[in-house]
Design a protein with these regions (language model features):
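Substrate-binding cleft and catalytic face of glycoside hydrolase catalytic domains
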Residues: 52-68, 83-161, 257, 300-305
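Aromatic-lined carbohydrate-recognition surfaces of secreted/lumenal glycan-active proteins
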Residues: 101-106, 150-161, 169-193, 242-250, ...
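Aromatic- and acid-rich polysaccharide-binding/catalytic face
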Residues: 136-155, 187-227, 244, 248, ...
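Bacterial Sec-dependent N-terminal signal peptides
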Residues: 1-23
Length: 336
C-alpha cells in the first residue's frame, strides 16, 4: 500500500471513533413475520442497510397472563410465525449471506406484557413448563436443522424466570443436547441484572430500551449523557460473567420524547419526531458499537415490504424510509 495512503487511513481512523471495523459485530435487524413467503426483493433492503444478521421470530400465543397453554405452529397463524415459515425466511435470508438468530416469542392476548406471565398454582406452573418446553424445543430443532448462528431461548419473561429458575436451568441443558450453536436470552432492560442463568449462555441478551432523556427532542449530547448511568452497569455484567453483551432488541420510535420511555408502544403517541429518533439511535451506536465487550444488536423492527412501510409520517419503531435508516446504514457498514 502507498505510504501516504496508509498514513491518511490511519489519520481517518484516529479522528473518527466510529471508523473502527464492524466486521465482527452483529449488525442485525428484527425481521417481522408476515403472511407472505419472502424472496430476494424482500431481503435486498436488509443487505442495503449493511446488516449481516436477521432475527427470525416465530410466535406462540397464550390466552392471558395466568393461562399455561402456548399455542404454536398452527395453520391459524401467519406463515412467518410458524416453523415452515421461519425456515423459508431463513433460507431466503441465507441466499443473501445474512446470518440468523432464531428468536421465538410469545404473544399474550390483547398485548399484555409477557414479563408478567404468572401462574396461580404449582399445577399450572408445571403445565406452563411443559407447554413452553414443547414450544422452545421445536425451534431449537429448527435452529439445529438450519445451522442458525444464535438461538434465543426466550424473550422478556421476567416472572417466569424469577419463580421457576430450575426449570430454565434444566431447559438450557436440554437445548444444548439438540442445538450446538450460540445461546442467549432476551432480558428486558430492567430485568437483565437479575437473570440467574447467564453463566449457562453465550451472550448476555438485553432488550435495550433504557431511558436516556426526558427532553421532547433529545439532542445527541443529551442521549450520550443519559447512557452514562447505564453503561457502567452493562459493562460490569460483561466483565463479571466474561460474556459479551448482545442487544437482542434496540431502537427508538420516531416520536416526541423518544428517549424517555423507549419501550412504550402506545398507539396514542402520534407526534412524529424524526430528529429525536436519529439522535437517540446515533448516541446508542457511539456509546456501544466500538466496545470490545459488546457483540452488537438487532434493530426493532424491520418489515419485509420495505417500500410500503415507515416513512416521514410514521411514528412507530421501524427505521425504514426514515432518516435514521441512513444512520444505521452508516454504523453497519463493513470496513473490509
Amino acid at each position: 500500500m502507498n505510504y501516504f495512503k496508509w498514513l491518511f487511513l490511519c489519520f481517518l481512523c484516529t479522528a473518527l471513533p466510529s471508523c473502527n471495523s464492524q466486521e465482527d459485530k452483529i449488525n442485525g435487524v428484527s425481521f417481522v413475520a408476515s403472511r407472505d413467503v419472502i424472496d430476494t426483493t424482500h431481503v435486498n433492503p436488509v443487505v442495503k442497510v449493511n446488516a449481516n444478521y436477521a432475527a427470525v421470530m416465530p410466535f406462540g400465543f397464550i390466552k392471558n397472563l395466568e393461562h399455561p397453554e402456548i399455542i404454536h405452529n398452527t395453520d391459524r397463524q401467519w406463515f412467518g410465525e410458524t416453523r415452515p415459515g421461519s425456515k423459508q425466511y431463513i433460507e431466503a435470508l441465507r441466499k443473501q449471506h445474512i446470518k440468523i438468530m432464531i428468536k421465538p416469542q410469545i404473544w399474550v392476548w390483547k398485548g399484555e406484557f409477557t414479563g408478567e406471565i404468572m401462574m396461580t398454582s404449582e399445577a399450572t406452573w408445571k403445565e406452563l413448563e411443559t407447554s413452553y418446553s414443547s414450544f422452545i424445543l421445536e425451534y431449537a430443532e429448527l435452529a439445529n436443522e438450519v445451522n442458525a448462528e444464535i438461538f434465543c431461548i426466550g424473550t422478556e419473561l421476567e416472572l417466569f424466570v424469577k419463580y421457576r429458575p430450575q426449570f430454565w436451568s434444566d431447559l438450557i441443558v436440554k437445548i444444548r443436547t439438540i442445538y450446538k450453536g450460540k445461546l442467549t436470552y432476551a432480558a428486558n432492560w430492567d430485568e437483565f441484572r437479575r437473570t440467574p442463568f447467564w453463566d449457562q449462555l453465550d451472550y448476555i441478551g438485553v432488550d435495550a430500551y433504557f431511558p436516556v432523556s426526558d427532553n421532547k427532542t433529545p439532542s445527541f449530547e443529551d442521549c450520550i449523557e443519559g447512557w452514562k448511568s447505564h453503561k457502567p452497569i452493562i459493562s460490569k455484567m460483561a466483565k463479571d460473567y466474561k460474556k459479551p453483551i448482545l442487544f437482542t432488541e434496540y431502537g427508538y420510535r420516531s416520536v416526541d420524547f423518544s428517549g424517555r420511555k423507549p419501550w412504550d408502544s402506545d398507539h396514542n403517541m402520534k407526534d412524529v419526531n424524526l430528529e429525536a429518533q436519529v439522535n437517540t439511535t446515533k448516541a446508542l451506536f457511539e456509546t456501544f458499537w466500538k466496545e470490545d465487550w459488546f457483540a452488537g444488536g438487532f434493530v426493532w423492527k424491520w418489515f419485509h415490504k420495505h417500500s410500503e412501510v415507515g416513512g416521514f409520517d410514521n411514528p412507530r419503531f421501524t427505521p425504514q424510509n426514515k432518516p435514521v435508516e441512513d444512520i444505521i446504514r452508516y454504523y453497519y457498514k463493513s470496513e473490509k
